[in-house]
Amino acid sequence: GDESATFKVDKIKHNNIEIWIQYPHRKHSQYNKLALGVPQHLSNNLPQYQDKSYDVSFAGQITHQRRQELSKAMPTIANSFYEPTEGFAQGLNPKSYYDKMFISKIIPCPSGQVVIDSFRFYETIEMLCLPIADNIDSKGNTMNYYNFLFEEEVPVKTIDNWNLLQTLVPELLSDYPNNMHQIVCWWIKYKRNLFIELMRQINA
């Protein structure tokens, strides 16, 4: 993907075209924006149904300032699972990763390497968990990224300071699973509407 937005999409000229951008930046406001979604291997590693036993879990790489901030907050959270890794795909295997996620209620979703969007945000929802979305990217820029990406108010809690996670978790748990159901329903509706819009553009 073009996460750094180096491809000059504005140079594309055609009288009958729809352009979709994954990892959109602010300069892509006029284009169709496509969510990153889940990795292909999720469908082959779906966990068996289990009760939620962790309040919070995070397994992933600690590579930039937002994840470093989260790495200091996670050990302070009661009833949590925390598995830091040194790099992408260097931690739990996919089956174990999704098993741990599925038995958790809340998943912090720190910024991706360049933009805020990441596989984890969508994996979290597909695993019937409640995501906490980052409001700050890896370079320290503040942006309500998911509202920008989906061009609507996304029903997800966002955070500017991961050190406040310990305070935020009890607040989210007090409304769980209602808040989780809300984001899952929103995601199902988005996927349906995306299919409808793609078919409309193809048939136009």
Regions found by a protein language model. Give the residues of each.
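Nucleotide-sugar donor-binding catalytic core of glycosyltransferases
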Residues: 1-154, 158, 185-203
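Conserved donor-nucleotide binding/catalytic region of nucleotide-linked donor-dependent transferases
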Residues: 164-186
